[in-house]
């Protein structure tokens, strides 16, 4: 006997969270809970404003239609990426095919005063990998901050993300302030320039490795080995079903590229599932999941070690 519930939720964000020039005051999304006999599976559907093609309202409409079809015996996945991902996670939990083991190590997202960051990162246990957003300020300032961190902590490796913010000139201004002796400790820089060709040229000219992120979701993208390209950053909420995520990871690994499972600012429930996916598909790579502290609460499932209050399922709005 099948049953299901869909929950709608909204989490207040910390002040200062800006995505593509818009302030994100709340994170809005949906959960689907599928039950069959004694088994249960959960999934999160939370399109990311400014990044997802679909809106939250569109996702809700597609999800509710899919749930009704599933209750009637139809299991075909929807095409909408955020819904396909959430539904496939719920089905995988229901079938016990999403392993429980999780990689809760997250490359910390570095914001704020560089001196404070140096103290925080120096005390980091084990492999020191951190993420810095660049492209929000002047390229020269970004270069100076990155250089300062790499100089102060000799065993630190940085993942940088420019979100296609730079012109070729700004990319060169950034690189000018990063000591060539430190550049090999930039694990990769995600999408430095507005076009892929400009990003490739940046990698060739600076010796700084790049990673594809937004490019993965463009229709003309193909997985090929390229000089200067070291990694792909896979955001499942923006990608689609678990099968599609796994195909992309396998395609990257076949080329010798690092594949990084990364957050689209999901709630704690979604983040714990991403940690499980990372342990399953990319066991040797620290995922990019350090986004929970951008929110003011956890929901349904806790992230280990987080002190944020937990909102129980009973407090969520039911749609069925």
From Swiss-Prot:
Pfam families registered for this protein in UniProt: MenC_N (PF21508), MR_MLE_C (PF13378)
> Which GO terms of the molecular function aspect are on file?
magnesium ion binding; O-succinylbenzoate synthase activity
Q: Which InterPro entries match?
A: Enolase-like_C_sf, Enolase-like_N, Enolase_C-like, Mandelate_racemase_C, OSB_synthase_MenC1, OSBS_N
Instruction: Cite the annotated pathway.
Output: Quinol/quinone metabolism; 1,4-dihydroxy-2-naphthoate biosynthesis; 1,4-dihydroxy-2-naphthoate from chorismate: step 4/7; Quinol/quinone metabolism; menaquinone biosynthesis
Entry-linked SMART domains: MR_MLE
Q: Which UniProt keywords apply?
A: Lyase, Magnesium, Menaquinone biosynthesis, Metal-binding
Cite the binding residues for Mg(2+): 161, 190, 213
Q: Supply the EC number(s).
A: 4.2.1.113
Q: What job does this protein perform?
A: Converts 2-succinyl-6-hydroxy-2,4-cyclohexadiene-1-carboxylate (SHCHC) to 2-succinylbenzoate (OSB).
Q: Cross-referenced NCBIfam families, in alphabetical order?
A: menC_gam_Gplu (TIGR01927), PRK05105.1 (NF003473)
Q: What is this protein called?
A: o-succinylbenzoate synthase
What gene name is listed for this protein? menC
